[in-house]
From Swiss-Prot:
Activity of the enzyme is enhanced about 20-fold in the presence of ATP. Its EC number is 5.1.3.8. InterPro entries: 6-hairpin_glycosidase_sf, 6hp_glycosidase-like_sf, AGE/CE, AGE_dom. This is N-acylglucosamine 2-epimerase. The record marks C380 as: Important for enzyme activity.
Length: 402
């Protein structure tokens, strides 16, 4: 027991120190003090190599700053709050393409002019998360009003009428459901319902619907988690149907663990650990070089995506959260061992001891393939969210052992 406590304590200190280093990188290099919002296209040393702004990453960074400000005392600092508010105001002014319509841009110029729109819900989802967290740290009702209004629009697009997303209905297109959509909605349900009984009640049934839809992606008699299924929850043919993303399954796993914890469903918890944590790890971990493959084919065929064998930052961040949460909820020491295995690989291969933050893209052997620290898909989100959540869970575990 004493050795376990010492190991947990060492990891808590290691994770906390790394969170401080990661946040120092973003605080120093990413703030646009002229227009508000954040630069996310940052080179290894933090230099800005492109000033385009990606709305989903803007929302994520606002959310992350507010969350740290609210949850961890050492981040309760004016510079975080001021930057989050400036980012939130930038989103309020510029994110929506044609107000009062709710559709948000995917890419903006530095000063906020729309460049590109995606026919998906993800910019809007992270806009919602940002506004809800801003409300929590400022108590300004206008932010919460924005969050709830956008949430209602997202639910309408997903469950009633997607035509507002602008996606054409083509006769040859397969009707499919990506696991990302119910995952994202479940994340929003958890976000808006936190310590808010009214909204928690309002979205309770939606949360259960999301969980059921995610669970439909467990196919082949429980032996595979597939990224895409039919609208009826059946396996699809071809590459689309066989497509697997181990890191995404692990992220879905901790979303479902959090849902099962709030609903007190021990049976669901056990099922999730088996199918969304252990199964993707067994198939997705590279036995030769370590790390999680980015994509896989459920039949063992060669995936068509060029990056399938690369090791990316975010699946490893999500795996750390998933295994530590699984251990915290179940007490199964095998899950704690998997947390240590993933965390050791991740800290060894991804972190940059010279300039701070983490590299995002490694080749199969674990060597750095892209030296950038941020871009269109990597911002101030997966790494600090992982580190902050792991620090909180490790603190709670140590308190239980005391």
């Amino acid at each position: 027991m004493e050795k376990e406590r010492e190991t947990l304590q060492a990891w808590k200190e290691r994770v906390g120190q790394e969170l401080d280093r990661v946040m120092a990188f973003w605080l120093e290099h990413s703030h646009d003090r002229e227009h508000g919002g954040f630069f996310t296209c940052l080179g290894r040393d933090g230099r800005v190599y492109d000033d385009l702004k990606y709305v989903w990453l803007q929302g994520r960074q606002v959310w992350m700053y507010c969350r740290l400000y609210r949850k961890l005392e050492r981040f309760h600092r004016p510079e975080l709050l001021d930057a989050a508010k400036a980012g939130g105001e930038f989103l309020l002014r510029h994110a929506r393409v044609a107000p009062p319509e709710k559709k948000c841009a995917f890419v903006l110029t530095r000063d906020g002019r729309p460049v590109k729109v995606q026919r998906s819900i993800f910019s809007e989802c992270f806009y919602t998360m940002a506004m809800n967290e801003l409300w929590r740290v400022t108590a300004e009702a206008r932010y919460q009003s924005e969050a709830v209004d956008m949430m209602d629009q997202i639910v309408h697009w997903v469950r009633e009428d997607p035509s507002g997303l602008g996606r054409p209905q083509l006769p040859g297109a397969v009707a499919s459901e990506s696991m990302a959509v119910p995952m994202m909605l479940l994340c929003l349900v958890e976000q808006l319902g936190e310590e808010d009984e009214e909204l928690a009640g309002r979205y309770a049934q939606l949360g259960h619907w999301c969980a059921r839809r995610i669970l439909q992606h467990v196919q082949r008699d429980g032996q595979a988690v597939l990224e895409n299924v039919s609208e009826d929850g059946e396996e699809l043919s071809g590459c689309l149907g066989r497509h697997q993303n181990p890191g995404h399954a692990l992220e879905a796993g901790w979303f479902l663990l959090r849902h099962s914890s709030r609903s007190g469903d021990a049976k669901l918890r056990a099922h999730v650990i088996d199918t969304f944590l252990l199964l993707p790890f067994r198939s997705g971990w590279d036995a030769d070089h370590g790390g999680l493959f980015y994509f896989q084919d459920a039949d063992g065929l060669c995936p068509t995506q060029l990056e399938w064998a690369m090791k990316l930052w975010w699946p490893h961040s999500e795996a750390m959260i998933a295994f530590l949460m699984g251990y915290s909820e179940s007490g199964d020491p095998a899950l704690l061992r998997l947390f240590y295995q993933v965390a050791e690989y991740t800290f060894r291969q991804f972190r940059d001891p010279e300039y701070g933050e983490w590299f995002g893209y490694l080749n199969r052997e674990g060597k750095v393939a892209l030296t950038i620290k941020g871009g269109p898909f990597k911002g101030c989100f997966h790494v600090p969210r992982c580190l902050a959540m792991c620090e909180e869970m490790l603190s709670a575990l140590l308190s239980r052992l005391a």
